[in-house]
Amino acid sequence: MKFCYRLSMGACFALQLASVPAFAQERLTPEEAGRPLVSEETAAEKQDAAKAEVNLKPPESHNWFDDLEGHIVVEAGVNGNPWTHTGRNWAQSYVDRANTATLNQITGTLSHPVSDLGDGYGLGFVFEVLYGSDARFNPTIGMGDGNLTGMYQWAPTQAHIDAHLPWFTKDGVDLQIGQMYGMQGFEGTDALERPFYSYNYSSDFIVPFEVVGVTATVHLAEHFDWILGVNAGNSTTFGGAKNNSRPKGYFGFAFNGLMDGKLDITATAYLGPQQSVYAIGREANHAMEYIGDLLATYKIDDKTSVTLNGTYFHDDYLQDDVYGVTVYYAHDFYPWLTFNARGEVFRDNNGGVVGNNIGTMSYVNELRGRNYAYDYAPGTTYGELTVGVSYRPQFINDNLAKGSLTIRPELRLDKSLNGTRPFNRTSATDTPGVGYADKGMNNMFWFSCDAIWAF
């Protein structure tokens, strides 16, 4: 979210994991995260298999629709911040309500993997809808925004056709056409696409949440992809739902499976004007916004990985530079227990980006170019340290009829590193609905826990 007395609008979030994949975020169950699903056959087992009776009858006919998949993810959480005077956690979007239990998301997905159509062509799709408090920050203007206006809203989050084309290079091109998650950043919207309940600053305030357009991944070599995309902008569509008349798009490269499969690196830029003509007029067509994102994940061994995510943002209209570096560490103590740690340093030069949307429709109205209620702070260098675990209780999961349960407690400390005091208190300003966070605390210690049921 962009917070500015000029009522501006810009790009904020989004989502990939270790590298930019060919298609939209795949839903991962906890058991799949970096662990083998089956063990390798022994020599004796291979001999027994060779002796097995062979069925020469023709297989039953298999059509394209047999591979349809449906998934549901339910996430609810609670957080505690006994020191707040505002009832909110400063600089948080999805986990903004302090000392409150929240139904964050019920996400339903219907998808089909990209399947061979013959002659090297493939076709698939993803349709996804989200209901819950998270939908406040995942709207796409022109696609059902404003149908619900309270704490709990709904939003279509993915609606794209996926295709593989045997064009240009030996390994061809992968296309996504339609509505999709933004591809920058490490922390995804889906609860299982991030290691923590809370988000880092870059995911909340810089990288795009949703885009509508076309994204192409050109496989130039075995470990090297070229990424290109054009879209309507962050969380907007076309016609009266656009932010301005200029296109926006991605450009970048991905290096996958380097160092014997241990290292993935992705570097992308997202470019184009993102301000709304309904807020600032025709200047919105020319005020450029630049977002650069570097993501590198190194797998130390089968149980341990380290990820580095660096992000830079500049907006010509806001005249603000925002940038940050986040380091993630993950270690599997057991198949059912993962330790996660995250450290971040994040700078908002003039305070035009980091803040809090106050109303349940604040972010939607910001995207629409309308007045909205928000709090902002002076330019601040933020530090953040989060530790937690992902616990998949075997005694529950072994007895569930469907899916699996993941519980993620976390402890988090946010701190101002340059002497400002934006946390836990705001002051009224002369502008109705706008608060200024400058007389609070220089740190915020809080704790959270969410539970995820995925099936």
Regions found by a protein language model. Name each.
Residues 11, 241-247, 433-436, 440:
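Hydrophobic secondary-structure block in the mid-to-C-terminal portion of proteins
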Residues 117, 136, 236-240, 276-278, ...:
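A generic structural signal for short coil/turn motifs at secondary-structure boundaries
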